[in-house]
Amino acid sequence: MTSTLHRTPLATAGLALVVALGGCGGGGGDSRETPPYVPKATTVDATTPAPAAEPLTIASPMFADGAPIPVQFSCKGANVAPPLTWSSPAGAAELALVVDDPDAVGGLYVHWIVTGIAPGSGSTADGQTPAGGHSVPNSGGRQGYFGPCPPAGTGTHHYRFTLYHLPVALQLPPGATGVQAAQAIAQAASGQARLVGTFEG
């Protein structure tokens, strides 16, 4: 005689509840705890940026670039060199200064050449030659500064104060003066900075 067990809906629901509760128990279930939050480490680049290289510059406290040169620095005044300030990047064996007039009646005229200027930053007062500098004869054969002196009626002349960065010690051709010396300096330079002043003829 076969006996058939008939479960009521209520009994079935009760059994399901017991199974569900058993799965949430402490002994038989997966009770692993969530690990504590650990913030991700941030990597900071501690490398100090290299300082910017000092630029090659030249200026004068007596006149701005493109402005008139005061009379005291011309042949109509005391005819002394204007005060200058300059800076240069590392890597120079020496600096050189050339002052010329491309508007001269007879063609380019070199007024002043100074070689052997100490690299770095520097300045001069009125009438001074840059530290360590040696004057080379200009277009007139004069060793030293000769200021603006354009003939009357020749209009505006532009006087270029050009500072050259020389990577190796300068070797001028024997007897080089004026334009020839200025050209040799320009060819040997690895950089230049320029200040231009004007003077009326």
UniProtKB/Swiss-Prot annotation:
It is a lipid-anchor. It is found in: Cell membrane; Cell surface. SUPFAM superfamilies: PEBP-like. Residues 122-141 are annotated as: Disordered. Keywords: Cell membrane, Lipoprotein, Membrane, Palmitate, Signal. It comes from the Bacteria. Residues 77-96, 97-116, 117-136 are annotated as: Prevents bacterial uptake by a human macrophage-like cell line. Its main location: membrane. One of its GO terms (cellular component) is extracellular region. A lipid is attached at residue 24 (N-palmitoyl cysteine). PANTHER family: PEBP (PHOSPHATIDYLETHANOLAMINE-BINDING PROTEIN) FAMILY PROTEIN, UNCHARACTERIZED PROTEIN YBCL-RELATED. Probably involved in bacterial recognition and uptake by its host (human). Belongs to the UPF0098 family. This is Putative lipoprotein LppC. It comes from Mycobacterium tuberculosis (strain ATCC 25618 / H37Rv). The gene is lppC.
